Regions:
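Conserved hydrophobic helix-helix packing surfaces used for dimerization/oligomerization
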Residues: 133-134, 278, 366
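A polyampholytic, Gly/Pro-enriched intrinsically disordered region
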Residues: 180-191, 224-228, 247-256, 406-409
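Nucleotide 5′-phosphate-binding alpha/beta core
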Residues: 1-94, 101-114, 121, 125, ...
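General small-molecule cofactor/ligand-binding pocket signal
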Residues: 143, 161-164, 228, 389-394
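Active-site phosphate/ATP/adenylate-binding loop shared across adenylate-forming ligases
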Residues: 2-7, 16-17, 70-199, 203-222, ...
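AMP-binding/adenylate-forming catalytic core of the ANL superfamily
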Residues: 284-386
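Conserved AMP-binding/adenylate-forming
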Residues: 217-305
Length: 409
């Protein structure tokens, strides 16, 4: 669908003023200027940045300035650059565990409307004027995800029905009736597809959680629809990047965010195509500009060009969290959910356990519960990680609440 359209790139051309001069190099130079302006603004108005002004504005050679989720949890108000009276919405993000402090993210009305500005071209890949979109994400209030999507879609004469998260499948099915596009989190959309296979949305947008390809394939098969994916988080102001009809990476919100990929240990930028930690600077935000924010997510810029003909770097599918990812000596990375994608797509794999040893060659040892062919398993893993030595054994796997790849020395 619309594989040649470049809605987000065109929006960036207009927002940045670069027009026909838009290239990856010119965009990065423009972004770096905006980040510098945001650093000066933040150092003047926010206590956190003011207390670290020298490190922010004049770092020592080889030093890098970053902020983390823990910085925000500790004193979120210290990141404010405006009066609390100008804050239109505060989002509280709980921390796993009973004692962890939550993150609180502050937005002005201007910040939130900028998100709607990005949603407008982003949703154009999967919708047409005159259609109906049902949103299975939070809320009716104007500055919720649903409310901002409503604002964005109304600009293109598209109707929006905001249902909220799926709690009752019958009610959700009723809300989805007649919709051309459904927006929701992957697991809930998969459940809805199984419960209501006769729904026939033309498109589905998945967001809010990691998107397994098995879910994409299931929705495409049951509903015979085209599935799009979105990347973003509360810290980015919800919007971050969205797939176009070519489905090869996220077209980024480059007019408001500068995305970088760094080595998680050294903090140095890594070459395009290399996996590392996703870092962003929300340079356009006025209320709480997060600058050089380490997300803890593993990603990379796509090494190839997009089928739509776009000229800007795209973010590849985010692989998960750093703490659940192992970086290989050859520059690749592997995580438990990546293995899930490969192994659970194979017939005869009921469960598995994995161990990885790097000494220095990487050896992946698998215990497979089921009757899958070991040679087939090795072949499929080598398609994704050609540098791994694979050892496959059959056996009973210990059930654990949280699975991970065991690192062996």
């Amino acid at each position: 669908m619309k594989k040649q359209e470049q809605y987000v790139d065109n929006w960036i051309r207009e927002r940045t003023g670069l027009g026909s001069a838009l290239t990856a190099e010119n965009l990065r130079a423009w972004q770096q200027e905006r980040v510098r302006e945001a650093e000066i603004y933040a150092a003047e108005h926010a206590a956190f940045y003011r207390d670290r002004k020298e490190a922010l504005l004049s770092p020592e050679p080889g030093q890098h300035f970053f902020i983390t989720a823990e910085d925000i949890r500790r004193r979120p108000e210290d990141f404010l650059c405006v009066s609390p009276k100008k804050i239109a919405r505060i989002i509280t993000i709980p921390t796993s565990g009973s004692t962890g402090r939550p993150k609180r993210i502050f937005f002005t009305e201007e910040d939130l409307m900028a998100t709607a500005d990005f949603f407008t071209p982003g949703m154009a890949y999967m919708t047409e004027p005159g259609q109906l979109v049902t949103v299975f994400m939070e809320g009716e209030q104007v500055y919720s995800i649903g409310g901002l999507l409503r604002i964005a879609l109304e600009r293109r004469e598209i109707s929006t029905r905001v249902h909220g998260f799926v709690h009752d499948l019958k009610e959700a099915e009723q809300a989805a009736q007649g919709a051309d596009c459904l927006v929701g989190v992957p697991g809930q959309m998969a459940l809805l597809a199984e419960a209501a296979p006769k729904l026939r949305p033309k498109t589905v947008l998945l967001s809010g959680d990691y998107v397994p390809q098995s879910v994409v394939r299931r929705l495409e098969s049951i509903w015979e629809c085209e599935v799009f994916q979105h990347w973003g988080m509360t810290e980015t102001g919800y919007g971050g990047g969205v797939e176009c009809g070519a489905h090869c990476g996220y077209h980024l919100r480059d007019a408001d965010l500068m995305i970088e990929i760094i080595h998680p240990e050294t903090g140095e930028s890594v070459p395009n195509g290399t996996w590392g930690e996703v870092v962003f600077s929300a340079f356009a935000r006025k209320g709480m500009p997060l600058l050089h924010y380490r997300t803890g997510d593993i990603g990379r810029f796509c090494p190839d060009t997009c089928g739509c003909g776009g000229v800007l770097p795209r973010l590849d599918k985010v692989m998960g969290r750093i703490e659940n990812t192992i970086f290989l000596h050859n520059g690749d990375a592997i995580s438990i959910h990546q293995l899930d994608e490969v192994l659970f797509a194979l017939d005869g794999v009921h469960d598995y356990a994995a161990k990885l040893k790097q000494n220095p060659e990487a050896t992946l040892s698998l215990t497979i519960e089921g009757d899958a062919d070991p040679d087939m398993i090795t072949e499929f893993i080598h398609k994704k990680w050609s540098g791994l030595e694979i050892r496959v054994n059959s056996g009973i796997v210990e059930r654990k609440r949280k699975r991970s790849i065991v690192r062996e020395k």
